[in-house]
């Protein structure tokens, strides 16, 4: 039996171990030990596991690919040893995270020479195993006679990325690219050098390894608007709903939540569950919304308004990223090759403007390779790295490319429509409820049984969607308020968000994590636009990211956030909130001291200090009805270049009324069907529009 086949056979059993502490079948266990070269003893196995995970914190030595995916999320049959092992790993991460050295370039991928070796020919090459790339590689490799190469710069998911509540700690591991924006003038003013963090995930699963896990599709109006802009009815809500449902495995774990069963998928590959349990503070937040006439709803019902416990990408309390969902179960496919620790530097385009393959650098061998695609190349690097790769390949704004000496293959507005949700992080409240604090070992034991604090994405326990003055009466959600436990503001958050020491101390430095919560205010349909540009023609430099948050000339974005602040304050003034003695924690920012506390001018100043990235960038390789207005056609094909598509968040020309992961996975499902149809393979759905 191959190593990959053994992995698949034990992978499903692992889920049971992690949730209930049950044991592996002896034959699977013995096969596993044999294939990794460990004798059949508990002590030897645990020593082997520690050797593998000692490298978790070390970017200098990429791990062996075979051992790495065996060690991923794999535990001993002895439950108490599992608790000891994972407790130690969590404590190591928490201890090392503050001093962990994150990358600031792609230097670790630089080859020793410029010689390029042949890597072979495949039917399809997918660059990037993120939210859409993992889906595309998985769906295309379902066709057994298609050879699919998936190029990924990072590693497989592991034990830490499996823990939903460790999302912030994962920012201080090799799963984070550690991008940051150029200095800003209209937002991020409380950050170091006025530069926002721009976190993107690196690994099989991409940013679904590092995000807050919220699964929200947005409004039917988003997709009908998209269909209208693209002049392609196949993107209408009615026609894309089957793709949402195809990927989803919805498990309504909160039986008291409002659920519309008909809009959900059951039995798909991507887990979706409700956030549990509800704290008394969250219950009061929901009651306050009810008191003001807002509906308790299933926000994935197509309308997208109302409040609810967060629907999140977990399965049995474990993070269910797209790598775990779409790639890990299928590593035994002989026609799917996953090339880890490999960074694509150029798309090969011939003189007839046909994409023929990809050049990539392998961090393990320190060599360059050339892989060819007989059918198509699909770029899935995300909203920052897809435009970077296209521009390095000569596809992009002519003036920008020529200024860097890059020959222009196709003049397109790549990187010129960076859009993002603008999120305000500055509302803190204390209550009379104190959250009990358990020792790490107790929390780990609960997690391994599928219960407790670690099974919940700590960044977002509940959400509420509202109309703004710009959408009132339309049912179009334009404001989101997220209910966040105060432990999301710990010292790691200061570093992760790049807050200055003064800003952090004035905002979050004196918060009692046990009795407080924060409300994040998110402007959904933003007008501010930024750019992604190359620093140089050197592919090993990070891109220049300039989001220009809150910069729209009409000030719609900041006005929308201000309106969200007013909604939040009105919620705090309800009977439901008074029952828990809610009180705003007023720590005036020195930067806004010239304004009367809580005046409109004060809030506008405060918003510019404390608004930054929600890590939802879109639009940099936007679909459009013509090449004059965008980068891709409605089938995600690059205008003017044959055999080349983009599939990730960058394809959406505007932000939606929900978090983007659901739409990104849907786009991956949809483009896979389009490709399969183009080459005569069976499709899941196809609407001619």
Model region roles, listed by residue range:
Residues 2-10, 14-689:
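N-terminal redox-cofactor-binding region of secreted/periplasmic oxidoreductases
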């Amino acid at each position: 039996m191959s190593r990959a086949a053994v992995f698949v056979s034990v992978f499903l059993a692992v889920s049971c171990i992690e949730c209930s502490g049950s044991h592996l079948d002896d034959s699977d266990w013995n096969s596993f030990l044999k294939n990794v070269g460990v004798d059949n003893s508990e002590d030897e196995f645990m020593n082997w596991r520690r050797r593998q995970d000692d490298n978790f914190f070390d970017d200098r030595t990429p791990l062996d690919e075979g051992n790495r995916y065996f060690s991923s999320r794999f535990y001993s049959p002895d439950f108490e040893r599992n608790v000891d092992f994972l407790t130690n790993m969590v404590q190591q991460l928490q201890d090392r995270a503050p001093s962990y050295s994150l990358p600031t370039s792609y230097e670790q991928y630089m080859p020793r020479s410029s010689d390029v070796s042949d890597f072979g020919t495949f039917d399809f090459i997918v660059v990037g195993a993120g939210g859409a790339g993992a889906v595309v590689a998985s769906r295309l490799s379902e066709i057994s006679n298609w050879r699919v190469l998936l190029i990924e710069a990072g590693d497989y998911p592991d034990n830490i990325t499996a823990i939903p509540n460790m999302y912030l700690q994962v920012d201080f591991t090799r799963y984070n690219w550690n991008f940051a924006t150029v200095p800003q003038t209209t937002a991020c003013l409380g950050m170091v050098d006025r530069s926002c963090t721009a976190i993107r995930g690196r690994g099989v699963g991409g940013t679904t390894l590092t995000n807050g896990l919220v699964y929200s599709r947005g409004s039917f109006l988003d997709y009908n608007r998209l269909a209208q802009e693209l002049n392609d009815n196949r993107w209408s809500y009615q026609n894309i709903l089957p793709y949402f449902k195809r990927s989803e495995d919805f498990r309504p774990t909160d039986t008291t939540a409002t659920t519309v069963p008909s809009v959900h998928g059951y039995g798909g590959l991507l887990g979706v569950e409700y956030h549990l349990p509800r704290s008394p503070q969250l219950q009061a937040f929901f009651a306050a919304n009810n008191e003001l006439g807002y509906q308790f709803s299933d926000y994935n019902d197509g309308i997208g308004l109302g409040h609810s416990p967060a629907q999140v990408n977990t399965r049995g309390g474990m993070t269910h990223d797209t790598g775990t969902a779409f790639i890990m179960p299928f590593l035994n496919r002989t026609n799917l090759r996953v090339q880890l620790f490999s960074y694509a530097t150029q798309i090969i385009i011939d003189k007839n403007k046909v994409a023929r393959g990809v050049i990539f650098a392998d961090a393990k061998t320190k060599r360059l390779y050339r892989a060819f695609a007989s059918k198509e190349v699909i770029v899935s690097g995300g909203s920052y790295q897809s435009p970077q790769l296209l521009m390095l390949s000569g596809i992009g704004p002519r003036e920008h490319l020529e200024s860097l000496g890059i020959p222009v293959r196709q003049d397109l507005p790549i990187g010129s429509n960076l859009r993002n949700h603008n999120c305000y992080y500055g509302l803190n409240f204390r209550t009379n409820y104190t959250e009990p604090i358990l020792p790490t070992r107790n929390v780990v034991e609960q997690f391994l049984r599928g219960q407790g604090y670690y099974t919940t994405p700590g960044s977002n326990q509940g959400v509420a969607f509202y109309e703004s003055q710009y959408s009132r009466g339309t049912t179009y959600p334009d404001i989101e308020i997220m209910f966040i436990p105060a432990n999301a503001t710990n010292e790691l958050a200061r570093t992760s968000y790049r807050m200055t020491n003064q800003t952090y101390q004035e905002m979050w430095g004196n918060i009692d994590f046990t009795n407080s919560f924060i409300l994040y205010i998110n402007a959904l349909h933003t007008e501010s636009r930024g750019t992604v540009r190359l620093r140089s023609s050197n592919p090993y430099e990070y891109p220049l990211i300039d989001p220009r948050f809150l910069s729209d000339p009409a000030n719609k974005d900041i006005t929308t956030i201000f309106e969200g602040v007013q909604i939040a304050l009105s919620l705090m003034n309800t009977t439901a909130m008074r029952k828990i003695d809610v009180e705003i924690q007023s720590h005036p920012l020195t930067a806004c001291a010239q304004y009367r506390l809580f005046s409109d001018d004060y809030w506008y100043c405060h918003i510019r200090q404390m608004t930054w990235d929600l890590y939802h960038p879109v639009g940099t390789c936007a679909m459009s009805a013509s090449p004059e207005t965008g980068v891709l056609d409605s089938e995600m094909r690059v205008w003017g270049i044959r055999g080349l598509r983009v599939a990730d968040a960058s394809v959406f020309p505007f932000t939606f009324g929900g978090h983007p992961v659901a739409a990104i996975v849907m786009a991956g499902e949809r483009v896979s069907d389009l490709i399969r149809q183009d080459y005569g393979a069976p499709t899941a759905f196809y609407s001619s529009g």
